[in-house]
């Protein structure tokens, strides 16, 4: 293991002398969303506010170009998908017309040809924040995420409390001091058909819903990795959705980032190797929860993982490290590798760089 990581450090040092993977993002970028269509990358929202940008990865002079602003206001934790020439944005957390923080269940569509947005007359049957989105056979699929009513109620209470610190402490204690199942994270799988703009029930997890999981899909299989089991408590679980045949099958794989797990990690594929990297969590929270402390992360400091794990022979192996721990950026499949754009580093600082993780013969290469 030490030899592997030492070799990785040498590779990282050699890449440092070369050109960066992508130009720095126009603003420090975290908690946003992004997609790739052929060779064009689109990113937006999160710490970028309502801004969206695109970049042609094959251009000689690579640069981010500003697009039309998102009309739905600033959003964190929205997701996106590119289907049949259009970019779709699903939900997110933002402020409503009254200035209250809330979870949205709406859908916006961006047309690259006209550089224009439209809000669709379509609403998911539940809120979408902390959820994941992936595309299969021309449809967008959504699963996971927080419970809209519980989350919105929490922020309504905080708004009413104003600057009353005593009231805020009581609200937080009430909100965090519950068991995981009492938060009703979404375990349903929903499908969105762009041609009809209709939502449909596509199945549900036999286990539990998560928020802030990493997602990657290839062919008929999709993997959901880690995420929150409740606010402040992560899981090390890995779920596999198999669309092969007529019946969707849910499988549970060996855990990763044990015992505490992380949220906001990055997942991808390279030469058929499943990759999981980064993420943030609270070390010791799982032990606290198992010992009966529901407010499991109380008093704990958020830590950021730099670990890179590969799925190999039915188990996860730590196979390398990022140059720094990071979470809550965008992960995309590009050039047969995992492309990470932006994210959040220690102290919650948003970053502007990109990272490319490639795998060959179970050996990891990291390019910054």
Curated annotation (Swiss-Prot):
It catalyses: N-acetyl-alpha-neuraminate = N-acetyl-beta-neuraminate. Keywords: Carbohydrate metabolism, Isomerase, Kelch repeat, Periplasm, Repeat, Signal. Kelch repeats lie at residues 40-84, 86-137, 139-173, 174-219, 222-265, 287-336, 338-367. The active site is at residue 228. GO terms for molecular function: racemase and epimerase activity, acting on carbohydrates and derivatives. Converts alpha-N-acetylneuranimic acid (Neu5Ac) to the beta-anomer, accelerating the equilibrium between the alpha- and beta-anomers. Probably facilitates sialidase-negative bacteria to compete successfully for limited amounts of extracellular Neu5Ac, which is likely taken up in the beta-anomer. In addition, the rapid removal of sialic acid from solution might be advantageous to the bacterium to damp down host responses. This is N-acetylneuraminate epimerase 2. It comes from Escherichia coli O6:H1 (strain CFT073 / ATCC 700928 / UPEC).
């Amino acid at each position: 293991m030490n030899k592997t990581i030492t070799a990785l450090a040498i590779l990282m040092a050699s890449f440092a002398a070369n050109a960066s993977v992508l130009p720095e993002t126009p603003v420090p970028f975290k908690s946003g969303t992004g997609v790739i269509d052929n060779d064009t990358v689109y990113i937006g929202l999160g710490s970028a506010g309502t801004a969206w940008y695109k970049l042609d990865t094959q251009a000689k002079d690579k640069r981010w170009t500003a697009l039309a602003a998102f009309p739905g206001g600033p959003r964190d934790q929205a997701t996106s998908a590119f289907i049949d020439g259009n970019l779709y944005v699903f939900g997110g957390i933002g402020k409503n017309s009254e200035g209250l923080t809330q979870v949205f269940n709406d859908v916006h569509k961006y047309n690259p040809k006209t550089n224009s947005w439209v809000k669709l007359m379509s609403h998911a049957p539940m809120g979408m924040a902390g959820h994941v989105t992936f595309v299969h056979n021309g449809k967008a699929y959504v699963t996971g995420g927080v419970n809209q009513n519980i989350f919105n109620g929490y922020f309504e209470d905080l708004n009413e409390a104003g600057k009353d610190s005593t009231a805020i402490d009581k609200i937080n204690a009430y909100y965090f001091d519950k068991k995981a199942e009492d938060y009703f994270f979404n375990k349903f799988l929903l499908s969105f058909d762009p041609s009809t703009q209709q939502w449909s029930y596509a199945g549900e997890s036999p286990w539990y819903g998560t928020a802030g999981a990493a997602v990657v899909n290839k062919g008929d299989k999709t993997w959901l990795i880690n995420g929150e089991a409740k606010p402040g408590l992560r899981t090390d679980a890995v779920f596999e959705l198999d669309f092969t045949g007529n019946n969707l099958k849910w499988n549970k794989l060996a855990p990763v980032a044990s015992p505490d797990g992380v949220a906001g990690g990055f997942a991808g594929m390279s030469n058929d190797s499943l990759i999981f990297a980064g993420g943030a969590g609270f070390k010791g929270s799982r032990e606290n929860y198992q010992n009966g402390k529901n407010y499991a992360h109380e008093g704990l400091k958020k830590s950021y993982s730099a670990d890179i794990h590969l799925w190999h022979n039915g188990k996860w192996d730590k196979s390398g490290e990022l140059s720094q721990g990071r979470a809550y950026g965008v992960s995309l499949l590009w050039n047969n590798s995992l492309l990470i754009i932006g994210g959040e580093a220690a102290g919650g600082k948003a970053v502007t760089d990109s990272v490319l993780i490639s795998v060959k013969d179970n050996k990891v290469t990291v390019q910054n």
